[in-house]
């Protein structure tokens, strides 16, 4: 009744808010001498948000028959007003000097510069109650005694200063060399670890420019290239991770009386440093047959070191949160290739491009921590393990569903409770686990129990390879284009709502019709039996490969058909161009697992899995005068 819209209109509640965005850009270019250009730029962005809310007291609703107040429909809290203010700003300034030199067949380009970035965030929140009138908009008119600051106030500030330089060298556009170096200093680190230096070098050889290639007319371009470079990353570093933080949100009991105290919530971490990325790449480019066929291929090795991980601190220290330390290393290596064929035959022209990329992801160092379990939701589990991929799912393996005959014969394992027909058949990974019926007299049931120690790696969400295709066809004034992409060798873990029908008021899915039931006791059914959501009947809720699905797919992202009206026609209508087009998005998807058809194959694991992107067809007209 309190949500009746007509009653809500009679309330004296109100809310006011305002948002302000501003952006400024300034820049200059100076050429003091020949071939020298000095450039400067400043970019400033500011965002401010203000909101003020007032909640009045509400009387009880009167019963429409008796006229008496209905208990529980009146407001039980005093009137109140809250104010919330957020402001953040970013300023980025750069200054560069560029000098170009040419002598003979030699070309040299020099660049040196510096940049400075300043980020500031502020937040204020205030609340007061017991206003003498609902018409007041001044928060100072509230009761001073009841002044509150829930959520508190916060200030965040971050600064980064960088110096960088680059040298490009080319000999006769045949031999190419580039050397880069940059030094970055961030306020997110302690002063002794604030700076990181990141060099890179790349070289190229245009083989097609050599004299011995001149006789091979069908080769337009052939280039061999190699590079090695390093970068620094602070995206995983908090603004104040190296600080010692104290918290007053602690009480201690003295003589049966709770006394407010202060504890060390975060220990100082002065050794915190940059995450480092080192990338080695060898590539080959080829254009042949008057550029009708193009090929580009790369082999890469990417090593990320000093990755931040939470280090477990003994509970006896009283430290709330585990400090982040530069502990882990990860390696990615793979092959990328793209090929394009283009041609024109009379009024018909076409371009077809395809690409494929493989990636082998492996954790090479966890600083002695062999497995670190992480949650991807209420139920989904990942594990970090040396020698395995990031995004490895950690759970129980299954082998179909129990039949009634297996239950009656005791050929099952216990997992907190005894299973029933239609429950998942978990497979133990430890040696010596027995069926319930094989227990000897007096032997504890635990010897027939599945435990968390039976969990193992059951899949991963990092694909083995990705691929895509782009097609463009033109005939006279007509054009047709299509773009599709796909992945292979990956899984997605569904959260409880997607797997179990009706859980947390979720809707059942069509694949739940394939469940095990007494009329269809299929031990290979895709979904186990339905059961009530009680703790005594949740044998199937544990994360297992039954909640993992093959998320390989090929997806037609866009398909477009267009027609350009001839220019000699549109000029008679006072137009310079006129084009009609019909475009479809998310029209077609091939999936390895049919159960996935209700979900977006590009979604990530966990509760964030979303429904399939909406199919859309749009007709439009582009015209210009």
Language-model segments: residues:
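Surface-exposed loop/turn segments flanking beta-strands in extracellular/periplasmic regions
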Residues: 1-5, 56-77, 122-150, 241-267, ...
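Outer-membrane beta-barrel transmembrane strands
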Residues: 6-53, 80-102, 109, 117, ...
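Extracytoplasmic gating/loop element in the C-terminal half of outer-membrane beta-barrel translocons
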Residues: 7, 61-63, 145, 186, ...
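Outer-membrane beta-barrel signature, preferentially recognizing the C-terminal barrel domain
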Residues: 10-13, 143-164, 251-294, 323-345, ...
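Small-side-chain secondary-structure face that scaffolds active or pore-lining regions
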Residues: 20-21, 29-134, 152-153, 187-193, ...
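Short loop/turn motifs that connect adjacent beta-strands in outer-membrane beta-barrel proteins
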Residues: 33-35, 102-108, 174, 208-222, ...
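Conserved small-residue
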Residues: 125, 344-459, 520
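C-terminal beta-signal and terminal closure region of outer-membrane beta-barrel proteins
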Residues: 327-332, 376-407, 518-524, 541-544, ...
């Amino acid at each position: 009744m309190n949500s009746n819209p007509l009653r809500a209109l009679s309330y004296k509640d109100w809310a006011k808010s305002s948002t302000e965005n501003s952006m400024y850009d300034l820049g200059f270019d100076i050429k003091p001498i020949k071939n020298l250009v000095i450039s400067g730029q400043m970019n400033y962005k500011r965002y401010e948000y203000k909101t003020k809310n007032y909640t009045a007291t509400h009387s009880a609703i009167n019963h429409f028959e008796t006229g008496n107040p209905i208990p529980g429909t009146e407001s039980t809290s005093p009137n109140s007003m809250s104010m919330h203010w957020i402001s953040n700003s970013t300023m980025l300034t750069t200054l560069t000097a560029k000098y170009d030199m040419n002598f003979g067949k030699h070309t040299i380009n020099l660049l040196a510069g510096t940049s400075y970035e300043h980020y500031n965030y502020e937040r204020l929140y205030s609340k007061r109650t017991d206003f003498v009138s609902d018409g007041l908009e001044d928060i100072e008119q509230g009761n001073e005694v009841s002044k509150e600051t829930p959520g508190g106030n916060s200030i965040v500030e971050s600064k980064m200063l960088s110096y960088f330089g680059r040298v490009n060298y080319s000999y006769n556009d045949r031999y190419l060399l580039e050397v880069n170096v940059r030094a970055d200093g961030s306020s997110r680190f302690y002063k002794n670890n604030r700076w990181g230096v990141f060099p890179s070098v790349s070289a190229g050889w245009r083989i097609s420019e050599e004299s011995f290639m001149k006789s091979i007319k069908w080769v337009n371009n052939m280039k061999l290239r190699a590079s090695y470079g390093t970068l620094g990353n602070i995206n995983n570093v908090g603004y104040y991770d190296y600080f010692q933080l104290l918290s007053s949100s602690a009480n201690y009991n003295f003589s049966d009386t709770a006394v407010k105290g202060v504890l060390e919530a975060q220990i100082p971490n002065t050794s915190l440093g940059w995450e480092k990325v080192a990338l080695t790449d060898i590539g080959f480019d080829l254009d042949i047959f008057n550029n009708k066929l193009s090929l580009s291929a790369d082999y890469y090795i990417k090593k990320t070191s000093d990755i931040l991980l939470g280090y477990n601190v003994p509970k006896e220290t009283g430290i709330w949160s585990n400090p982040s330390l530069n502990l882990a290393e990860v390696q990615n290596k793979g092959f990328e290739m793209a090929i394009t064929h283009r041609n024109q035959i009379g009024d018909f022209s076409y371009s077809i491009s395809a690409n494929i990329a493989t990636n082998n992801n492996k954790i090479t160092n966890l600083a002695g921590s062999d497995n670190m379990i992480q949650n991807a939701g209420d139920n989904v589990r990942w594990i970090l393990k040396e020698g395995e991929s990031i995004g490895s799912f950690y759970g129980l393996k299954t082998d179909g569903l129990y039949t009634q005959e297996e239950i009656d014969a005791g050929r099952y394992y216990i997992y907190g409770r005894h299973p029933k027909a239609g429950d998942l058949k978990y497979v133990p990974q430890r040696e010596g686990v027995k069926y319930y019926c094989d227990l000897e007299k007096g032997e504890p049931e635990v010897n027939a129990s599945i435990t968390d120690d039976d969990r193992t790696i059951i899949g991963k969400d990092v694909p083995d390879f990705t691929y895509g295709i782009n097609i463009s066809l033109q005939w006279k004034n007509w054009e047709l284009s299509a773009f599709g992409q796909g992945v292979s060798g990956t899984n997605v873990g569904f959260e409880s709502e997607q797997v179990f029908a009706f859980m947390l008021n979720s809707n059942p899915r069509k694949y739940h019709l394939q469940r095990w039931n007494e009329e269809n006791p299929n031990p290979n059914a895709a979904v186990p039996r339905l059961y009530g959501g009680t703790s005594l009947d949740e044998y199937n809720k544990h994360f297992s490969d039954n909640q993992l699905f093959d998320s390989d797919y090929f997806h037609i992202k866009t398909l477009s058909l267009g027609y350009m009206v001839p220019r000699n026609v549109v000029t008679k209508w006072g137009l310079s161009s006129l084009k009609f087009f019909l475009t479809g998005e998310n029209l077609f998807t091939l999936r390895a697992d049919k159960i996935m058809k209700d979900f977006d194959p590009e979604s990530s694991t966990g509760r964030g899995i979303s429904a399939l992107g909406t199919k859309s067809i749009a007709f439009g007209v582009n015209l210009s005068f």
